[in-house]
């Protein structure tokens, strides 16, 4: 579960290293987000020559959470940390050209096919 003020690792090569959630999209009273949800983030730590700079505000898709992900078949997936992929606000395409680490199959149901195709492993 991701809420406001949560710090996340960035799982792409956009140049950002750490981001902070500043808004959960999807309703005025919505407080938490999970895998596949879109959030608004602020870049807190960035690489020197990346596409994004520290302080930039972007949208991001959550690809990994430390909170359990329960599936219909009874299996449970959990990761060591929280991670997101920065996306373009208008097109919804990832800003980076590579994805690092595994992503979950639930992204397919949310129509984030580009992230699934770039990921090295889909769990």
UniProtKB/Swiss-Prot annotation:
One Gene Ontology biological process: translation
Pfam families: Ribosomal_L14
Database matches in PROSITE patterns: RIBOSOMAL_L14
GO cellular component: cytosolic large ribosomal subunit
Record's keyword terms, sorted: Ribonucleoprotein, Ribosomal protein, RNA-binding, rRNA-binding
Quaternary structure and partners: Part of the 50S ribosomal subunit. Forms a cluster with proteins L3 and L19. In the 70S ribosome, L14 and L19 interact and together make contacts with the 16S rRNA in bridges B5 and B8.
Family to which the UniProt record says this protein belongs: Belongs to the universal ribosomal protein uL14 family.
Protein name: Large ribosomal subunit protein uL14
């Amino acid at each position: 579960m991701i809420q406001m003020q949560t710090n996340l690792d960035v799982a792409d090569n956009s140049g950002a290293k750490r981001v902070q959630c500043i808004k959960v999209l999807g309703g005025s009273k919505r407080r938490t987000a999970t895998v596949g949800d879109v959030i608004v983030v602020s870049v807190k730590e960035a690489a020197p020559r990346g596409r994004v700079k520290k302080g930039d505000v972007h949208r991001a898709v959550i690809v990994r959470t430390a909170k359990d992900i329960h599936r219909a078949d009874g299996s449970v997936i959990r990761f060591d940390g929280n991670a997101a992929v920065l996306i373009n606000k208008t097109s919804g395409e990832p800003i980076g050209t590579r994805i690092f680490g595994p992503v979950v199959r639930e992204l397919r149901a949310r129509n984030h096919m580009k992230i699934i195709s770039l990921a090295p492993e889909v769990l």
